[in-house]
From Swiss-Prot:
NCBIfam families: PRK04208.1. The active site is at 175 (proton acceptor), 294 (proton acceptor). Binds 1 Mg(2+) ion per subunit. The record marks 334 as: Transition state stabilizer. This is Ribulose bisphosphate carboxylase large chain. Heterohexadecamer of 8 large chains and 8 small chains; disulfide-linked. The disulfide link is formed within the large subunit homodimers. Its main location: plastid. One of its GO terms (molecular function) is magnesium ion binding. Residues 1-2 form a propeptide. Keywords: Acetylation, Calvin cycle, Carbon dioxide fixation, Chloroplast, Disulfide bond, Lyase, Magnesium, Metal-binding, Monooxygenase, Oxidoreductase, Photorespiration, Photosynthesis, Plastid. InterPro entries: RuBisCO (IPR033966), RuBisCo_large_chain_AS (IPR020878), RuBisCO_lsu_C (IPR000685), RuBisCO_lsu_C_sf (IPR036376), RuBisCO_lsu_fd_N (IPR017443), RuBisCO_lsu_N_sf (IPR036422), RuBisCO_lsuI (IPR020888). The basic functional RuBisCO is composed of a large chain homodimer in a 'head-to-tail' conformation. In form I RuBisCO this homodimer is arranged in a barrel-like tetramer with the small subunits forming a tetrameric 'cap' on each end of the 'barrel'. It comes from the Eukaryota.
Length: 477
């Protein structure tokens, strides 16, 4: 009898409740290349052994429920069940374990991050037998990742579209984020772009509010970037936020952006949802638009160390769903992000093949095959003094985005943009000459100030600004 038709008629149905570990804890299991693998940080309730807790996670996120049901006999649990195949204690914690779970590929709809997350990070996170549960990492098999389009274009295609090579790209979020009229907003974009930036950006919560409707903003921003392009001879872009209350409205905004001829649109992928994001990514590939992704709401999910989901999982999900840029933290700015951990998921966004490296929080070797990469965006509380560190940490394939660090310049937006561009060019030149940006960064910036009054003014304003707080989410030691 085949596994799909196998039943338990020969032994009969036995009603009742039995321990999850009897069915779902299988330490002898050898994982398959086609399995989706998950690493969960599990904190059981007092008295619940780790084997039972890990098995409960495997069961409740796959085929199991709280009691035996007679319809179990109509399928093959051995074919479809999730399996907790390994458990290890968390260093420095008395009642916390990393439980590894393998899921058969057939549990998931092809090309659907929504379906994958509905199972793996669904109701199991409210399970009473667990005090806390966090998804630390996923291994996406090539057999599954190949069912996704992924980023609309990827890093190399974006470089070619923009004709910009050999350095990080520079951006700026327009501030104040809310309250400007469309014409004043467009003017701010123009000044930043003509001053030397590659991109300006809608803030994540700029959609279509009474003070600035989306269509007006799109028109004035398009005018700004075309004027800046004509003056500078460089291709410019503004991330037009297409996020909307419905998918239909979102696509309508993206269509209008394409009709204006702009190079890039934007989406808030967590608040907007993975289904909407994947739809927009498909539209962007079909119509030649780059897609910038903001991660608003991520910290609600990923900041606490014991419960939720690590951002590296959200980053992998975004690469599958589709986006050409995504905000990734700065390491040195105002937002959460430990250096090694941040670089770990930056590699997961950009590289084709990433080896397991627990020191950087990477639990599994990940092979993306031919899926395009995503450019990480460093944004949040950064200014010209951070430029050497950002250039050294993120490398060329990144966007360094200075909002207040551009618009807060004492002489205005265009001088603020010029200061950032001069600082970046100085750091790239110094790096290419073999200088150590980590050690000589301040010296490099001071030297550049001698021939850039805009940079000198920026350095004076932000010379004492630091954000020195310990990150909440750190690597286990």
């Amino acid at each position: 009898m085949s596994p799909q038709t196998e039943t338990k008629a020969s032994v009969g149905f036995q009603a009742g409740v039995k321990d999850y570990k009897l069915t779902y804890y299988t330490p002898e299991y050898e994982t398959k290349d086609t399995d989706i693998l998950a690493a969960f940080r599990v904190t059981p309730q007092p008295g619940v052994p780790p084997e039972e807790a890990g098995a409960a996670v495997a069961a409740e996120s796959s085929t199991g429920t709280w009691t035996t049901v007679w319809t179990d006999g109509l399928t093959s649990l051995d074919r479809y069940k999730g399996r907790c195949y390994h458990i290890e204690p968390v260093a420095g914690e008395d009642n916390q374990w990393i439980c590894y779970v393998a899921y058969p590929l057939d549990l998931f709809e092809e090309g659907s991050v929504t379906n994958m997350f509905t199972s793996i990070v669904g109701n199991v996170f409210g399970f009473k037998a667990l005090r806390a549960l966090r998804l630390e990492d996923l291994r996406i098999p090539v057999a599954y990742s190949k069912t996704f389009q992924g980023p609309p274009h990827g890093i190399q295609v974006e470089r070619d579209k923009l004709n910009k090579y050999g350095r990080p790209l520079l951006g700026c979020t327009i501030k104040p984020k809310l309250g400007l009229s469309a014409k004043n907003y467009g003017r701010a974009c123009y000044e930043c772009l003509r001053g030397g930036l590659d991109f300006t950006k809608d803030d994540e919560n700029v959609n279509s509010q009474p003070f600035m409707r989306w269509r007006d903003r799109f028109v004035f921003c398009a005018e700004a970037l075309y004027k800046a392009q004509a003056e500078t001879g460089e291709i410019k872009g503004h991330y037009l936020n297409a996020t909307a209350g419905t998918c239909e409205e979102m696509i309508k905004r993206a269509v209008f952006a394409r009709e204006l001829g702009v190079p890039i649109v934007m989406h808030d992928y967590i608040t907007g949802g993975f289904t909407a994001n994947t739809s927009l990514a498909h539209y962007c590939r079909d119509n030649g638009l780059l897609l910038h992704i903001h991660r608003a709401m991520h910290a609600v999910i990923d900041r606490q160390k014991n419960h939720g989901m690590h951002f590296r999982v959200l980053a992998k999900a975004l690469r599958m769903s589709g986006g050409d840029h995504i905000h990734s933290g700065t390491v040195v700015g105002k937002l959460e992000g430990e250096r090694e951990m941040t670089l770990g998921f930056v590699d997961l966004l950009r590289d084709d093949f990433i080896e397991k490296d627990r020191a950087r929080g990477i639990f599994f070797t990940q092979d993306w095959a031919s899926m395009p990469g995503v450019i990480p965006v460093a944004s949040g509380g950064i200014h010209v003094w951070h430029m050497p560190a950002l250039t050294e940490i993120f490398g060329d394939d990144s966007v360094l985005q200075f909002g207040g660090g551009t618009l807060g310049h004492p002489w205005g937006n265009a001088p603020g943009a010029a200061a950032n561009r001069v600082a970046l060019e100085a750091c790239v030149q110094a790096r290419n000459e073999g200088r150590d940006l980590a050690r000589e960064g301040n010296e490099i910036i001071r030297a550049a100030c001698k021939w850039s009054p805009e940079l000198a003014a920026a350095c004076e304003v932000w010379k004492a600004i630091k954000f020195e707080f310990e990150p909440v989410d750190t690597i286990d030691n």
